[in-house]
Amino acid sequence: MENVSMNKSRYIPTRDPIFTETMQIGIVVRNLDASLRRYVDDYGIGPWEIHEFTPRDANNLQEYGQSVERSWRLAFTMVGRVMWELIEPLDEESVYARFLAEKGEGVHHIAVATPNFDDTVAEQAKRGNSLVLSGEFSGIKVAYLPTDRDLGMIIEIANGTPVAEENVN
């Protein structure tokens, strides 16, 4: 195991972390309205801010390096210090729609802070990994790293705080 040294029964990194704080959990759902009712009525989670994402809301939206136009509905709320994001795809081809078809509803990605967005993206490219999704939203660059093979989940990084976080709750 490169970059890791054993100390007693713990693994201790020998490099600086590329992920420093969990900011968001992205959950893909089939029906946003039904899911919101379940989250609010059954679990008391909310209030939620709802948005519709259209192709005009992103600059240079790409999936696996290919330019795409996608639409989806989103809802955001804060649970403690972590934003919960519900995502309903409005097309059949997006990474979210494919996730639903293959795995059903559930956690699609975890968004984390990273000390250097560009270096983290470059490191993935050096490993030969195409970004799952990337683009710019409200001036913030976002990238979904293909860490699902290594970590069992997609990691989202951004070069700023999501705009929705400033407006939720």
Please provide the spans of the model-predicted regions.
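Vicinal oxygen chelate
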Residues: 2-16, 27, 29-34, 44-47, 78-83, 85, 90-95, 118-169, ...
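N-terminal beta-strand motif that seeds the catalytic metal site of vicinal oxygen chelate
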Residues: 2-36, 44, 105-112, 167-169
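A short alpha-helix capping/helix-coil boundary motif
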Residues: 13-17, 53, 98-101
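Extracellular/lumenal glycan-associated surfaces
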Residues: 24, 28-30, 38, 80-85, ...
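Conserved short beta-strand elements that form part of the metal-binding/catalytic scaffold
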Residues: 46-98, 140-163
